[in-house]
Swiss-Prot record:
Coiled coil: none annotated. Pfam families: RecA (PF00154), RecA_C (PF21096). It comes from Chelativorans sp. (strain BNC1). This is Protein RecA. Can catalyze the hydrolysis of ATP in the presence of single-stranded DNA, the ATP-dependent uptake of single-stranded DNA by duplex DNA, and the ATP-dependent hybridization of homologous single-stranded DNAs. It interacts with LexA causing its activation and leading to its autocatalytic cleavage. The keyword Repeat does not apply.
Length: 360
């Protein structure tokens, strides 16, 4: 009896294998070769290609060394928090590797002089200033399907105004129209983005929900679709000022990885954004160096390999700016200790910045 049962199981196994092979060949005949495959059959499928954010600390916090290609990214935060700066840094890093980038300026507010200071190659940057939200997303879809563009930035979701709203009267109520526009566009874009390996960065603004008694009243514009389709969501906030004597020369910025499909989320990192310069790389080297034990701190003095960098953080930053070889050595040491640094990053506060961050 046991032998008969064993033979039946073996025959079922053979039948299943044959049935699966027949199904796979039928799918490939109908939809083309490569429409279905075993994940382990191609090593390239598993690898995650990334582009640096321009911030060493944020690259480490993301867990994969930067923002992933072929994915949708959302960067949101209050006004003047550094959203566009972070997106432009990513564009500059992609261009350094020979990539082609596009900037869809729905807000009509891109400053070319500032972009150049951040390292963006303006001569090779594709820019569009569309009239309507439909036009902006159609341009984005066409660029993605071309397969020739590496990074596309949409600035911002809040400025993607539906055509019906522009053609209607001022004050006319059109509830949910922008959310429907985003939902339809993202359904179309997702498959094309994955196939073309293009990174699409959506910059978003924050709004307040009325009548919220418990939890954060903050939410992002454009409905819920972007929260679900985004592989990485970054919450960027200004937490203080960087001062040179009495003059404010930059912002202290905190970025929380609210959602991450590539690595564990909820890591957060702090860095300086200097006016006219962007992310302060030397400031990050000092802060991360101390956190990783690469840079020693005794009182107000910072030192590296028994060499004094300066008294006080600002003097240490100036020393690294004037001595790029030492800065390069520290950066190399930090990249080798990336895992250790990631563990030491503080997790985001339990209350979170958006009450719906956990849902997405």
């Amino acid at each position: 009896m046991a032998q008969n049962t064993l033979r039946l199981v073996e025959e079922n196994g053979v039948d299943k294998s044959k049935a699966l092979d027949a199904a796979l060949s039928q799918i490939e005949r109908a939809f083309g070769k490569g429409s279905i495959m075993r994940l382990g059959a191609n090593d390239k499928v598993v690898e995650i290609e990334t582009i640096s954010t321009g911030s060493l600390g944020l690259d480490i916090a993301l867990g994969v060394g930067g923002l992933p290609r072929g994915r949708i990214i959302e960067i949101y935060g209050p006004e003047s928090s550094g959203k566009t700066t972070l997106a432009l840094h990513t564009v500059a890093e992609a261009q350094k590797k020979g990539g082609i980038c596009g900037f869809i300026d729905a807000e009509h507010a891109l400053d070319p002089v500032y972009a150049r200071k951040l390292g963006v190659d303006l001569e090779n940057l594709l820019i569009s200033q569309p009239d309507t939200g439909e036009q902006a997303l159609e341009i984005c879809d066409t660029l993605v399907r071309s397969g020739a563009v590496d990074v596309i930035v949409v600035d911002s979701v809040a400025a993607l105004t539906p055509r019906a709203e522009i053609e209607g009267e001022m004050g006319e109520s059109l509830p949910g129209m922008q959310a429907r526009l985003m939902s339809q566009a993202l359904r179309k874009l997702t498959a094309s983005i994955s196939r073309s390996n293009t990174m699409v960065i959506f910059i978003n603004q924050i709004r307040m929900k009325i009548g919220v008694m418990f939890g954060s009243p903050e939410t992002t514009t454009g409905g819920n679709a972007l929260k679900f389709y985004a592989s990485v969501r970054l919450d960027i906030r200004r937490i203080g000022s960087v001062k040179d004597r009495e003059e404010t020369v930059g912002n202290q910025t905190r970025v929380k990885v609210v959602k991450n499909k590539m690595a564990p989320p909820f890591k957060q990192v702090e860095f300086d954004i200097m006016y006219g310069e962007g992310v302060s790389k030397t400031g990050e080297l000092v802060d991360l160096g101390v956190k990783a034990g690469v840079v020693e701190k005794a009182g107000a003095w910072f030192s590296y390999n028994s060499q004094r960098l300066g008294q006080g953080r600002e003097n240490a930053k100036l020393f690294l700016r004037d001595n790029p070889e030492v800065a390069r050595e520290i950066e190399l040491a930090l990249r080798q200790n990336a895992g250790l640094i990631a563990e030491r990053f503080l997790e985001a506060d339990k209350d979170g910045s958006l009450d719906d961050a956990a849902e997405s």
